[in-house]
Regions:
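RNA-binding accessory domains that recognize and position tRNA/RNA substrates
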Residues: 1-23, 29-33, 37-45, 57, ...
Length: 212
């Protein structure tokens, strides 16, 4: 997997040949003047998409639905009821606990989309024909009871990705990228002793040795 910014061009995305795209959550409003908007043509290139939280609102906004400021924020655990199952919600209990963290909400869904779940608001919508699925809640956190299964459904059943990821492959790729970027230069690293900086230190030292 690779994390890229919202303003990555469509050509750059296509060049990467992703099996799928996840539009992540965030604190912004799609209705703000400085909203982080992606190229709407991303929905027309045939790559499966999963929109999470802000990613759902973004999908609705760009494709002709409406997103409004909520009367009250929804933060914390919420009951999620599936109203129409789809490939991402396959095998998920009709009622389950999910984790919400949003203020804006989808008021009307775009043409071609169906509401697939609700809480106090529209909690999921999808255009199954185009392999576009969205969730207002966060499936990636442990508080969402069956969130891991939803992500698994998207990655393996919708995107048809293979279960071939290995930590050693990531280490080798990262070490190679560090060597290429650093070249003959030296690196100064501020080490806090936490997990992130410690892992970074090990990888950088493995890549460039005494240049660190």
């Amino acid at each position: 997997s690779e994390v890229v910014p919202f303003n990555t061009t469509l050509d750059e995305i296509i060049e990467k040949k992703p099996a799928g795209i996840i539009l992540s959550g965030g604190p912004s409003s799609v209705n703000a003047e400085d909203a982080h908007l992606v190229d709407k043509n991303i929905f027309e290139i045939g790559i499966p998409i999963l929109g999470i939280c802000y990613g759902m609102q973004l999908t609705a906004h760009l494709l002709g639905g409406t997103v409004k400021k909520g009367t009250k924020g929804e933060y914390g655990k919420a009951n999620f009821e599936i109203t129409k199952s789809n490939s991402v919600l396959s095998g998920i209990s009709r009622n389950s606990t999910v984790w919400m963290s949003h203020f804006d909400e989808v008021e009307t869904v775009p043409e071609g989309f169906e509401i697939s779940g609700k809480s106090d608001v529209v909690a999921a919508m999808a255009n199954e024909k185009k392999n576009i699925f969205t969730l207002q809640f966060h499936p990636e956190v442990s508080h969402t009871e069956e969130g891991a299964k939803m992500i698994e459904n998207f990655v393996f059943n919708v995107c048809k990705a293979e279960k071939n990821w290995k930590l050693t492959n990531y280490i080798d790729k990262t070490v190679s990228e560090i060597r290429e970027k650093v070249g003959n230069d030296k690196v100064i690293l501020g080490l806090s002793g936490g997990v992130d900086s410690s892992v970074a230190a090990v990888l950088i030292h493995k890549a460039i040795g005494d240049q660190l």
